[in-house]
């Protein structure tokens, strides 16, 4: 977790509240996602850590984002630039998504498998996790050959390791003790 998370929280809350009030959650998430990608660019990161005046920095950033930012998004960037906080936009995005997930009662579930899963398998995992977590889930699938077979499911602090690699690791621990 980033050291900027505490700084990012009030900005994320303000953006989230504005987006809810104006029924524009998708638009705001897209603007924040694009802005976060811009801040990750090496050239932009150097500019953010430089000694540019806030107005110049905001204008530069808004110019790079182009039509990806509407007027309210541009105002948000100006406020963040005035306070020297543009580098925390990725953390603002993370907090914004967390607030949205909490409001929509959804949870991100990461499913790691050795091979692509069928739609039937994904549906079964989704249904089981929705029942276990008592909320809707969004599956994010990854392929990792090191799991050998089976799946590893992560949802927040919950980890369900049904992989062959996990079983072998547990067997090794038992044999060594």
UniProtKB/Swiss-Prot annotation:
Cellular localisation: Cell inner membrane
Membrane protein topology class: Peripheral membrane protein
One Pfam family from the record: OSCP
Gene Ontology MF terms: proton-transporting ATP synthase activity, rotational mechanism
Keyword Nuclease: no
Keywords in alphabetical order: ATP synthesis, Cell inner membrane, Cell membrane, CF(1), Hydrogen ion transport, Ion transport, Membrane, Transport
Disulfide bonds: none
Subunit structure: F-type ATPases have 2 components, F(1) - the catalytic core - and F(0) - the membrane proton channel. F(1) has five subunits: alpha(3), beta(3), gamma(1), delta(1), epsilon(1). F(0) has three main subunits: a(1), b(2) and c(10-14). The alpha and beta chains form an alternating ring which encloses part of the gamma chain. F(1) is attached to F(0) by a central stalk formed by the gamma and epsilon chains, while a peripheral stalk is formed by the delta and b chains.
Family: Belongs to the ATPase delta chain family.
Function: F(1)F(0) ATP synthase produces ATP from ADP in the presence of a proton or sodium gradient. F-type ATPases consist of two structural domains, F(1) containing the extramembraneous catalytic core and F(0) containing the membrane proton channel, linked together by a central stalk and a peripheral stalk. During catalysis, ATP synthesis in the catalytic domain of F(1) is coupled via a rotary mechanism of the central stalk subunits to proton translocation.
Stored NCBIfam families: ATP_synt_delta (TIGR01145), PRK05758.2-2 (NF004402), PRK05758.2-5 (NF004404)
PANTHER family named in the record: ATP SYNTHASE DELTA CHAIN (PTHR11910)
Name of this chain's protein: ATP synthase subunit delta
Source species of the chain: Edwardsiella ictaluri (strain 93-146)
Lineage of the species this protein comes from: Bacteria, Pseudomonadati, Pseudomonadota, Gammaproteobacteria, Enterobacterales
